[in-house]
A protein has these predicted regions:
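Nucleic-acid endonuclease domains
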Residues: 1-68, 76-222
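Acidic/His-rich structured neighborhood in mature extracellular/periplasmic domains
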Residues: 72
Length: 222
C-alpha cells in the first residue's frame, strides 16, 4: 500500500523530478511554443511521477487544484516571462493570499532541429506556502501604513489606489479588517484581469531565506 502524499514528500519528489526530467529530449515537445501546452504536459508528467510513488487525490485546472490532498496547485512557466493565471475568487486574495499552496516549475525550452525533439531544462522550482501567496507590493504597503500609525481611512485610500476590485463599502470593510488583522507579506506579483495574473520573478530571484518559501531548485541566473 502506498504512503499518502504530504508536503515534505511533494517537495522531495519535485526535486527528483526536476533532476531526472531536465534535458530529456522528447518528440512530443518539438516545435511547441504554446506555454499552456508545455505547462499541461509537465503537469501530467509530474502527477504521474507522484502517483507512481504515493497515494494522492488528483484534481485538474477545470475543477480546482491539481493536488487537492496537499492543498497545492502546480504552475509551470517559462523563464522568459515567469507568470501564469489563476481563477479569481475574492478580492482579498491579493491581500491575504490565494488560500492554497503553489509549486512553481520554471523551465527553459530548447529544440533539437536535427532529431526533431524538444527538451525542458528546469532552472527553478519553488514551493510557496499559502501564507506567502499574496501580492508583495500591496502587503508591504499595508504594513508600512500600519507601522506608521495609519488608520482605516489611510488603508482604504491605499486599496483604492491599488485598484483592488471591490466597491467602496466592501473596500472600507476590508480596510477595517486589515487594521485588526494585518496580512503576512506575500511574495507574488498579482495583477487584475478576468483572472488573477501571477508573476514569479521575485520568487525565482529570491536570495533570502523566507519562512513558507522552499527553494527546491535554485536559479543561478545563467
Amino acid at each position: 500500500m502506498k504512503e499518502a502524499l504530504d508536503t515534505e514528500k511533494l517537495i522531495n519528489c519535485a526535486r527528483k523530478f526536476c533532476s531526472c526530467q531536465s534535458k530529456v529530449y522528447r518528440s512530443e515537445l518539438f516545435g511547441i511554443t504554446d506555454g499552456k501546452a508545455v505547462g499541461t504536459f509537465v503537469e501530467h508528467l509530474f502527477k504521474d511521477f507522484l502517483a507512481q510513488q504515493y497515494d494522492l487525490t488528483m484534481g485538474n485546472s477545470a475543477n480546482g487544484l491539481d493536488l487537492p490532498s496537499v492543498n497545492t496547485d502546480i504552475k509551470v512557466t517559462s523563464i522568459k516571462q515567469p507568470q501564469s493565471s489563476c481563477p479569481y475568487k475574492d478580492s482579498k486574495q491579493r491581500i491575504y493570499g490565494l488560500g492554497y499552496n503553489l509549486i512553481v516549475f520554471v523551465y527553459q525550452k530548447e529544440d533539437d532541429e536535427t532529431n526533431k525533439k524538444g527538451m525542458l531544462n528546469f532552472l527553478s522550482c519553488t514551493y510557496i506556502d499559502s501564507s506567502r501567496t499574496a501580492d508583495y507590493q500591496t502587503t508591504i504597503g499595508l504594513h508600512n501604513i500600519i507601522n506608521n500609525k495609519g488608520n482605516a481611512d489611510d488603508i482604504y485610500a491605499f486599496l483604492a489606489d491599488r485598484n483592488i476590485p471591490a466597491d467602496e463599502v466592501t473596500l472600507y470593510q476590508m480596510a477595517q479588517d486589515i487594521l485588526k488583522n494585518p496580512p503576512t507579506i506575500g511574495y507574488l506579483t498579482i495583477s487584475n484581469a478576468l483572472q488573477w495574473r501571477l508573476q514569479y520573478s521575485r520568487i525565482v530571484s529570491l536570495e533570502d531565506n523566507v519562512s513558507g518559501i522552499t527553494s527546491i531548485v535554485k536559479y543561478d541566473g545563467k
